[in-house]
């Protein structure tokens, strides 16, 4: 090797060593070829270094990779720079509400029922109230049992309608018809006035009916009506005028209804539960023996039942028939025709009235004749206003022309009118007529005045 080639070869070896290429063969080459290879090796080393650096970054991302946040803003620089489209956003929200996931299966929201529970849970009662205004207009009357009928927010009104609806087993049409008839009847009869202002014949109705209140530890005040039919002295006189009897009976009933205080109610009756606004009735048939045969009493009884079943529904809690004789079977038969099965179940016949007190926890408060310890009804109970009947005038004496001549008559003209022509012939033979004036202390009266004399006055 010449001296000239040595420096060139040494420089090439140094360049290869600096580039880290240990695989370059140490072979003598032509100077030009060697120089080209050196240049190529240098270029390869320069290219490979960045690739190795990239591989290192891939192998150690947590150490050498730049933070992700640094490259994120370059994703969509144009979109982030634009202002938001408000209309588009609102349209997109509306579309999501209508077409969002699960929108087809989502049930529609029902409006909240703000009505009272007694209406929301009782569609029949709610329907009944919808018809109330029309009923009141047709009847032209709005008072029932002392309650002025208003609307579904008025508790006393609600209780009245519940009673009519229950009496008709939830049938709104029947309840509507009955309420209308009852209102029309009250307008015609004015039962409040019958109870508060009218008076009734004592000779017909004294001792026949009473109203009394007793205290029950659980229920509070219990209202009783008593009908004592054994006190009737003259059946034809008491029951003969059916209208008068019904008015008396209605007056007694209105007294009891007033004691129930329906107009002061503050809580609604439980439609399917107990009703605190009801009374107990007692009918006493002690010594009654006329009800089977007397058609007048049968007529009065049937008409009374008809009126009460229409005008006073659901006011009866229980009804006791005490001292009932066997012949009273027709009464219960009649009741079954006019009243519902629910009402019939409230009836209790008792043969011996003394056993009545056993039916109640307040037995001692009942009169002694019914098994209690209290005074009899005449002293312990109330009744309707009675009036003393004006004594009827005694029958007038018959006119002298039609009557037999009195034995003490001294009026000759009266004798002449009364006697026949044959008796006139014997008139002169009768000395008594001449002596008669001495027996009379009163002055003679004209014959015409004798028609106004009573039998006792004539005898004087």
UniProtKB/Swiss-Prot annotation:
InterPro entries: CRAL-TRIO_dom (IPR001251), CRAL-TRIO_dom_sf (IPR036865), CRAL/TRIO_N_dom (IPR011074), CRAL/TRIO_N_dom_sf (IPR036273), Sfh5 (IPR042938). Residues 26-35, 105-118, 416-429 have a biased composition (Basic and acidic residues). One of its GO terms (molecular function) is phosphatidylinositol transfer activity. It is a peripheral membrane protein. It catalyses: a 1,2-diacyl-sn-glycero-3-phospho-(1D-myo-inositol)(in) = a 1,2-diacyl-sn-glycero-3-phospho-(1D-myo-inositol)(out). Non-classical phosphatidylinositol (PtdIns) transfer protein (PITP), which exhibits PtdIns-binding/transfer activity in the absence of detectable PtdCho-binding/transfer activity. Regulates PtdIns(4,5)P2 homeostasis at the plasma membrane. Heme-binding protein that may play a role in organic oxidant-induced stress responses. Belongs to the SFH5 family. This is Phosphatidylinositol transfer protein SFH5.
